[in-house]
Amino acid sequence: SQPQEPRRITGTITDTKGEPIIGANIKEVGTFNGIISDINGRFALSVNPNAVLEISYIGYVTTTVPVKDNKVLSIEIKEAEQSLEEVVVVGYGKQKKESVTASIASISRKELVQTQQSNISNMLVGRMPGLIAFQRSGAPGEDASSLLIRGVSTFTDNTAPLIMIDGIERTNFDGIDPNEVESLNILKDASATAIYGVKGANGVVLITTRKGERGCPRLSYSGNFALQQSTQLPSYLNSADYATLYNEALENDSRVSGSTYQPKFTDKDIELYRNGFDPILHPNTNWIDDFLRKFSTRTQHNINLSGGTERVKYFISGSYFDQTGIYKHTKIDSDHDVNPRNTRYNFRTNFDFQITRDFSATVQMAAQIGRVITPGSGNSGIWQAISFANPLSSPGLVDNKIVRIQDGLGSVNPWQTLLSNGYQKDNRNNINTTLRLNYDLSSLLTKGLSVHGSIAYDSYYYSRKKYSKTFPYYLARRDAEDPDYIYLIPQSEESIWSVSTGWDKNRKVYMEFGIDYNRTFGLHKTTALILYNQSKYYSPSLQYYVPNAYQGLVGRLTYEYASRYLAEFNMGYNGTENFAKGKRFGFFPAVSLGWVISEEKFFPKNNIVKYLKVRGSYGEVGNDQIGGDQIGR
């Protein structure tokens, strides 16, 4: 008998409301044959006899439809709802949500970008249970939050969680554009983090970046512009009240010491402070209003392209971010501005290649190019000067000159603090590259068995230029012959700009090789993982640092019966050169159990408690962030 010829079918893809789905993926199961729906949700495809179609679209439940004898199909797909079938990212793998026995919190990209912030750590504040965040500054480039998972877990000064981006340890967490993120998971207890061994004591943040989906190219743009302002600013005394209270303090001192009371300010001085008729020699400076803008700006733009075929899928993203400071009058000349500023460019490409039916590859590259400008005195130094400056010490800037008053009580001048300490310009460049290969051995050895290998190369370069210049300050004096005339006497000379430079660079190479097993036998489901990894960190710019290496062996075994009884064992055996010889390696095991009570026959079916799981765990983890370099310790 001769094989039957392929036949042509047509159809329409709609949602539950009858609206056409544009760009839905229609694939003949078991082949590379497929197409996407057009603007009206229609498609035409030649298929083999007895073909089964798989229809998928982002945000909708994947649906399979047997063709049978139909020549025209009307296919309805439903929106996906979050369920226990949802897959969550765990250490070196993925698990169904219903099978997880560890403590894991998750947030999706859609939820993440609902809060527009300058970095991801600030987007997480108040969004995930067990996560504690401290924001110590609001200055551009310094406003990232410090994160703690379930509080302080170690005795060292570094209590930050381990950051894993697409399975690789990386530190440029807050430089990632949130539009590049697919999901973010936090591993909180030892049963979840023991697989990271000596690095898992402070918890782990797992970031998975976006990948392409099969279908036509999708171009997406997002942008936002924000005005930022201080949430709360202190109120200070005006000059008249300050002078009055200063006189009262002198009077109280004289009573205690028995000396003659001599007021510092006359009634006429206080009246001039109050009425503002002599604004230079009797100023009433509100340093908050004089020094700070009402608003600063933040701008963010992202454009990304995604799509793919059965063989190649891609995600390409580029973004721009800019955040300005809140100080006034900081542009010294056309080339120099001491106002804080954070500017960043992000680029990312993720490619997935299905080379054969069993062999696949992933190539990822990300770059962050950033520049941060900070005042030479530091933002904390400027705020300290504003807090300590009294309102009668200076009229501020007069004709763009820094002016002091002879009787300013020795107060600091915030303008001199800001302008005469110059500024620092930091350039920070990160490049991350990853190659991952995966081979499915199901057809060669046994079903559910696969091997994978990864290699990553990360490079970081930092350069600093510090610009310094001394600005003259002037003393205001009244002309003895013409009391209406006030002249400014220079008290220091202006210097030319000087520049000092510095730099730093480092690189890291990471490799891993793993064997995965995932198999279901009736009501029994088991998974296993054995993985070897190593990394080497090198920083040639630092005098006393020597290359730092890490090696580890990772294992995981899970068992599930009837989606009811769950057991999991994780272990990490790893070591680092941060410790002395003979004490570099440690074994970190963890075991966890789970019982899905709601799957038992005796559990009453109701709409109040639909799912109930009890779990418990025990594990040991370590911390290698003990500070300093090997020789210094």
Could you tell me what each predicted segment is?
Residues 354-356, 499-510, 518-633:
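Structural signature of Gram-negative outer-membrane beta-barrels, strongest in the C-terminal barrel
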Residues 230-232, 279-319, 323-327, 338-413, ...:
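Flexible loop and strand-edge segments within Gram-negative outer membrane beta-barrel domains
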Residues 219-227, 318-320, 363-369, 453-459, ...:
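Transmembrane beta-barrel strands of outer-membrane/channel proteins
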Residues 212-217, 310-311, 326, 358, ...:
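Short loop/turn motifs that connect adjacent beta-strands in outer-membrane beta-barrel proteins
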Residues 209, 221, 303-309, 349-353, ...:
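Residues on the lipid-exposed face of transmembrane beta-strands in outer-membrane beta-barrel proteins
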Residues 321-344, 366, 372-376, 381, ...:
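Small-side-chain secondary-structure face that scaffolds active or pore-lining regions
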Residues 229-267, 368-408, 461-484, 612-633:
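A surface-exposed, glycine/aromatic-enriched loop/edge motif typical of exported proteins
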Residues 1-347, 361:
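Short, small/polar-rich motifs associated with maturation and membrane association
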